Amino acid sequence: MNITVVVPVRNEEQSIRLLLQGLLEQTLAPAEIVIVDGGSTDATRRIVEEQARKHSHLHLICETDALPGKGRNVGAASAANEWLAFIDAGVSPANDWLAQLAEAVRLNSQTDVVYGSWEPVTDTFFKECAAIAYGYVPTEEVDATFIQSRAVFSSLLRRSVWLGVKGFSEELRSAEDLLFIKRIDDAGFIVSYAPKAVVRWSMQPNLWRTFRRFVTYSRHNMLAGLWKQWQASVLIRYGLLAVCAAILFGLTSWWPIITLGLFILMLMARAIVALWRNRRRYPAGVLRNSTRLFGLVPLLATIDAATIVGVAAWLVSDKLLGRPSV
């Protein structure tokens, strides 16, 4: 089975070596690896070029200001094979990742799309809390194994699927993968799962980086029209808190303190729910979970703030001023 692996990258000098090493050490070697650089200003291109000189099946395509969707489209268009595997920079595949994806096709030759699984990297306390806060809990069981939510960055599909759904949206920095998956579902392609095809996904390392990333996620999720799946609940939650604050304002001079207390209680309740939902994935005693609770509260507040800022950026820049998204 000949497979082309497509990887969109931009300014990934810190992670690209690990990704390339993982792809070059696959037990099922890809027939072709296509790296599409979207305009890196760091050493990413040089690193890929060095490896390409050593491995003839590794190719680098350079684009200018290409977002992930365009990068995947360019890579898929240049692919020499019918089967396309997608993975992202900042992600590290297990050595049998590609073999496990291909095995799903062998078991069902009618398969059009295979989704693998992914695991967040939790090598620091902050990343552990991040995984609990926004790393999705596996909810779908396949062959007695629970898998994570479907992700393009751990997938294998026929070239005809990519053509059939007209590729990825090229104007979005994020959420283009969610739209792509939705189009696949709407088109009725045959989907299989490979829960043992695992990649490891790097979380953001601190609050500031998390805030910046979620502002981008939020803005582009709005551009993609997927706000009901995310922003709606956040806006309702804080809308109700604002209503409570307005009522308290007319009743007592203590309204700021009471409102702050309600805000903290809301965050703590969500943190406790997150800990409970992740109790099997990240088991811990009372002391460890108490520590996690105090890590989760500011993290959830940061994500909520970023979500609202992203919505505001979409409203002002994209709806009112009509500026192109970046």
Predicted regions and their residues:
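Short, acidic, metal-binding catalytic loop of nucleotide-sugar glycosyltransferases
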Residues: Q21-P30
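A conserved acidic beta->alpha catalytic loop
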Residues: D37-R46, V91
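Glycine-rich, basic loop-to-helix element that forms the pyrophosphate-binding segment
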Residues: E63-A79
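Short aromatic/hydrophobic "clamp" motif used to bind/position activated sugar donors
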Residues: L84
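Conserved donor NDP-sugar-binding/catalytic core segment of glycosyltransferases
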Residues: D96-K127, S202
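A recurrent flexible, glycine/aromatic-enriched loop bordering the glycosyltransferase active site
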Residues: P120-V121, P138-L157, R173, L179, ...
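Catalytic donor/gating beta->alpha subdomain of glycosyltransferases that bind UDP-sugars
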Residues: S169-Q229
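Membrane-embedded multi-pass helical conduit in multi-pass membrane proteins
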Residues: L240-S317
